[in-house]
């Protein structure tokens, strides 16, 4: 009797760290691996359940030092479990060790799971741009495209995404020694907003300064219009 060859139905999964602010993704297997926010007294895990407004208010009034902690290799491996094809998007590697940890976890996962493949993309950004990449990955997977094609097309798409942002406060930067406290205080009193972008190298860099929310939105819009070939995300 002739034997029929049965091909394994490959299970795909998209995974992102919590800097993307994406905690659920419809119609695809998805996981969000949380970063942690650390103060001198407490550790906050950045999950969907965290009270973001309360945390933001605490950060505004907190006088001590704050920092973040990225997911470790074990965290990533737990998220990869059960998938044959894994697609990962991380916060820029210039700000966090999440990308390197995800890469190392991918190598370990492929070695311990025969036939598994892991693709890790450094967003070279954070926040809204990572979300854009994740949503495009989901569309490619739902279209039934093979692993190598998905990887190739998301890299090409990434070349045309761009993050612009405005900072309402410099308080956290001052607490961590990035700017002088006096500069942060003056900026707060004058209502100065810092306009920045994620550079091609993955650094978050300052473009200009403006006053007030209206001025910040106007400047962001002008920058966006000046670069029509990019899919800009304003955060």
Report residues per predicted region.
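Short, Lys/Arg-enriched N-terminal segments with co-localized hydrophobic residues
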Residues: 1-9
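Short, surface-exposed connector motifs at secondary-structure boundaries
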Residues: 83-87, 117, 226
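Class I S-adenosyl-L-methionine
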Residues: 42-111
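Mixed-charge interfacial surface used for oligomerization/domain docking
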Residues: 9-12, 18-27, 31, 35-36, ...
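A glycine-rich beta-strand to alpha-helix segment
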Residues: 90, 119-120
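N-terminal low-complexity segments that are often proline-rich with Ser/Thr-Pro
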Residues: 232-235
